[in-house]
């Protein structure tokens, strides 16, 4: 659901500029440079997410997600469009055509829908989100808060 896009409308330029700068700072905390603004909002994301689900089921999903985000935030390449999808899968030495076909299998799509519904029911509205005993913490900068909260409860 992309109805809650934080970087638009143009009337929110001050907030948008702040958010992109914050992403740059957070990236530096993790030891890499972010090329911002990155393509956003995304024009497509379902297939990329379905590929990630397939990959998580098969053990290569984390590598796929890391490469996807590196290309997005370090190279400015939108995650779910070609040739980016194919290039990522090739870098991982995966059979691109088979992965594309299997990622669109109704079982994977069903899992994608169920995962999304589960997230909504838990109160997740953005990424990254962390949940501890029903409490939602949204944003990379809230991970520490989630950990502190878990120690208090």
PLM region spans:
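Structural alpha/beta surface segment adjacent to cysteine/selenocysteine redox centers
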Residues: 1-72
């Amino acid at each position: 659901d992309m109805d809650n896009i934080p970087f638009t409308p143009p009337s929110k330029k001050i907030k948008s500029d702040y958010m992109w700068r914050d992403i740059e700072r957070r990236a530096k905390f993790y030891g890499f440079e972010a090329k911002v603004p990155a393509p956003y909002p995304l024009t497509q994301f379902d297939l990329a997410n379905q590929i990630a689900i397939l990959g998580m089921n098969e053990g290569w999903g984390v590598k796929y997600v890391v490469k996807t985000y590196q290309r997005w935030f370090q190279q400015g390449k939108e995650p779910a469009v070609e040739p980016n999808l194919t290039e990522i899968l090739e870098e991982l030495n995966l059979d691109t055509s088979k992965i594309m076909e299997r990622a669109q299998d109704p079982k994977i799509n069903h899992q994608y829908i169920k995962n999304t519904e589960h997230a909504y029911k838990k109160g997740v509205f953005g990424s990254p989100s962390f949940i501890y005993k029903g409490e939602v913490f949204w944003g990379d900068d809230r991970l520490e808060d989630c950990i502190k909260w878990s120690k208090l409860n």
